[in-house]
Amino acid sequence: YRDGFCQAEKAEAEKLGVDVYNLLNEKAAQVPAGSYGTICCFRDVMNYIHWTHASPTFTNFELDPERFNKYTFYRAILENTALLVRGHIELVKDATGNEPDELVFAGGASKSPLWAQILADVCHKRVRVPQVKEATALGSAILAGYGVGLYPSIAEGAHRVVKWEQTF
């Protein structure tokens, strides 16, 4: 989406020396929850029995550039993704009877407070963002520490090393 529709924002971000997603999130935060009714369907909840995939679509928008613009569509993408996470949590709960009490939002997407808040609102769960966003590298370091005896358990290693930046 960024590369296909947000060239002006990419140029502005480069000029300002900021991440383009900061600009997109700032504008999308001004769009009300529900994106004025715009429905994004870029993905669908996994169907493991009949492997299907939704065709990417936007529906229920009007030709009104004040309300229905690239920031509305961007927010609708974030909302769609949050709904997918909720759907997958429900699938796991239906299959196992268990669901997480909270979600950890790591990686590049965790740099978006807007997306983390949307995820918390849609899933009705606390979303925690770690200080170290690259969870794979941090997890590898924790496992290495456990492997050489630095930590008595993996859980203890995680408890000592993982620090939380923000909770939504």
Task: Give, region by region, the residue ranges found by the protein language model.
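Short acidic (Asp/Glu) and glycine-rich catalytic loops that position anionic groups and cofactors
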Residues: 2-7, 56, 118-123, 159-165
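Short, hydrophobic alpha-helical segments
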Residues: 5, 89, 144-149
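Residue-level recognition of short, structured coil/turn motifs
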Residues: 6-10, 97, 124, 149
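Activation-segment/catalytic-loop signature of the eukaryotic protein kinase fold
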Residues: 30-138
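Cytochrome P450 heme-binding "Cys pocket" and the immediately downstream C-terminal segment
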Residues: 146-168
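A short helix-loop
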Residues: 1-49, 158
